[in-house]
Amino acid sequence: MPPVRPMLAKSVKGVPAADAVEGGLVYEPKWDGFRAIVFRDGDEVEIASRSTKSLTRYFPEMVAAVRELLPERCVVDGEIVVVNGDRLDFDLLSQRIHPAASRVTLLAEQWPARLVLFDLLAIDDEDLTEQPFSARRERLVAALDGVDGPVSVTRVTDDTAVAEEWFDSFEGAGLDGVVAKPLTSTYAPNGRVMLKVKHARTADVVVAGYRLHKTSTPDRPLLGSLLLGLYADDGRLQHVGVAASFTEQRREELIEELAPLVATPDDEHPWSAWQDEEAQASGRLPGGQSRWTGTKDLSFVPLRPERVAEVGYEHMEGDGDGGRFRHTARFKRWRDDREPESCTYEQLEEVARYDLADVLGAG
């Protein structure tokens, strides 16, 4: 089964009109999970990630579902998601990437994954990648007609107003935005043919530390990322994420700019217990070991929590004082007019809940 890179999307600021491109656009919900190209050839099933790495061993229940529900020989494009109550849960999904097969099996039983499909690349001996998306979509729907269970076809609309309503509402079910697809486009692996609209918000956060960049040297230290915090109701400064993606010049400047704030052993830094397992369990601190970090050096340079920055983010993962930024935040500017103590979770926009079953229920 040769590797296939999925077709990608480029970001746009708002939901484009249906006639924005020649041939027209249709819209789909943007699912927040693991992108997957799934191959089936009889009993042989392979699940490949966006970067073509194998995900098969991490989703045994998905392999069984593909054998039961997908055509005998096919290649499909979709998203693997995990449902927790009435919304998607990316944290639970991420836990699947674990070296222990016993742990993967347990998670598959407790939190079974779903496969949401949105494209059909091949069926039997027929390559569909040169056909327009409208035809591929029609073939996908026909191939899964009557299928019920953990494999489904994403819903679609050609109505811009409906897409805008989805964008506003579906975030409450854990979705990520809206994708617009040209009806006449062929399948372009690794090509940014589609358009995506994601939520964009800002927050004022406390900068309480930084990590050095991987190219940093003792003679020329370079900042890699800023460690960001928000105050919980009980007064604890919770680590909510990082801001990165600075130019090399800016990395050097930030080292000098933040030097006066570097904490000393006499300072009572709110994250001084970051290496303590009990402290990690009781509150959100930077540096917790996980399946993603492995043996990576997670140490950081602590800063007195005296400066506030405005950052851009898409959405929060988790509820209340345990929330964190789902992706790396974007540094926008310093907010020296703000007091660090004013940087609380209360400033964040609350997203109204939406019933995920409604999103999954229509193909």
Positions of predicted regions on the chain:
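Catalytic cores of nucleic-acid ligases and guanylyltransferases
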Residues: M1-G363
